[in-house]
């Protein structure tokens, strides 16, 4: 494990990284929000179905 090489790699990546534009940030936020909503909706649907089954929650 070459620590110096690893640190140089991390520094190189950080130098290439840039702040996203507002449009890019907005698009990523919308997609992430939609994903969170869908996962929550799926969990709610599973909970609702399990509540109606005999021996459910």
UniProtKB/Swiss-Prot annotation:
Annotated localization: Cell membrane
Spans traversing the lipid bilayer: 33-53
Superkingdom field: Archaea
Presence of keyword Phosphoprotein: no
Membrane-related topology note: Single-pass membrane protein
Annotated GO CC locations: plasma membrane
Keyword tags: Cell membrane, Membrane, Protein transport, Translocation, Transmembrane, Transmembrane helix, Transport
GO molecular function, one term: protein transmembrane transporter activity
GO biological process, one term: intracellular protein transmembrane transport
Family matches, as SUPFAM superfamilies: Preprotein translocase SecE subunit
Database matches in InterPro entries: Prot_translocase_SecE_dom_sf (IPR023391), Translocase_Sec61-g (IPR008158), Translocase_SecE/Sec61-g (IPR001901)
Family of this protein: Belongs to the SecE/SEC61-gamma family.
Function in brief: Essential subunit of the Sec protein translocation channel SecYEG. Clamps together the 2 halves of SecY. May contact the channel plug during translocation.
Record's subunit section: Component of the Sec protein translocase complex. Heterotrimer consisting of SecY (alpha), SecG (beta) and SecE (gamma) subunits. The heterotrimers can form oligomers, although 1 heterotrimer is thought to be able to translocate proteins. Interacts with the ribosome. May interact with SecDF, and other proteins may be involved.
Protein name (record): Protein translocase subunit SecE
Organism field: Haloferax mediterranei (strain ATCC 33500 / DSM 1411 / JCM 8866 / NBRC 14739 / NCIMB 2177 / R-4)
Gene: secE
